[in-house]
């Protein structure tokens, strides 16, 4: 639900009315289907943990059915402490691009681990995964395979999300575009960039 400052992976613009959020949660959960929030912004600071919009989403959906995907240890710790009913998924944004790193992550307290998608077609490595039943494969990535800047892309997208949310606080009726990014937030050249902002 935009504008979630905790969002990562792809910049989400727009806004959602709190009543709409509540209706979506009740409708989807009413069918026994969990929602999984993609709170994977790697650039979060402690000041972002108290974000009213994101905490409201977490409170509205705090019923033991829903899930959250995380990359930030800071946010993960905050969610585990304040919203212990949520199942937590480890994000592909962590760039766990070896089987050893993936297996280590699977030993931690995660419901699922989303694999780095550079592993998706490396079948000889996939056979070495210890807990395949707790792995998830991402099939709609924004980056090209083996993108050398993927970690930086995630950071830049996280900064864009923060900039967007801060912009909305100052100018709630203003239109946010690439042209009015705050100073210090740079866009990068990437064939997939248009699909992220």
Residue ranges and their predicted role:
Residues 1-101, 110-197:
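Active-site pocket-lining/capping segments in soluble small-molecule metabolic enzymes
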């Amino acid at each position: 639900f935009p504008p979630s400052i905790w969002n990562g992976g792809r910049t989400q613009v727009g806004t959602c009315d709190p009543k709409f959020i509540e209706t979506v949660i009740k409708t989807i959960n009413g069918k026994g289907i969990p929602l999984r929030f993609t709170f994977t912004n790697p650039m979060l600071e402690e000041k972002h943990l108290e974000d009213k919009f994101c905490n409201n989403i977490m409170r509205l959906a705090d019923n033991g059915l829903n899930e959250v995907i995380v990359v930030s240890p800071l946010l993960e710790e905050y969610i585990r402490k304040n919203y212990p009913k949520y199942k937590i998924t480890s994000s592909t944004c962590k760039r766990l691009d070896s089987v050893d790193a993936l297996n280590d992550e699977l030993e931690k307290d995660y419901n699922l681990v989303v694999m780095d998608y550079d592993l998706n077609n490396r079948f000889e490595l996939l056979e070495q995964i210890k807990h395949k039943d707790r792995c998830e494969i991402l099939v709609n990535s924004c980056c090209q395979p083996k993108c050398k800047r993927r970690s930086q892309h995630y950071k830049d997208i996280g900064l864009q999300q923060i900039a967007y949310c801060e912009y909305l606080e100052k100018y709630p009726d203003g239109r946010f575009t690439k042209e009015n990014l705050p100073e210090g937030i740079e866009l990068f050249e990437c064939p997939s960039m248009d699909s992220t902002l």
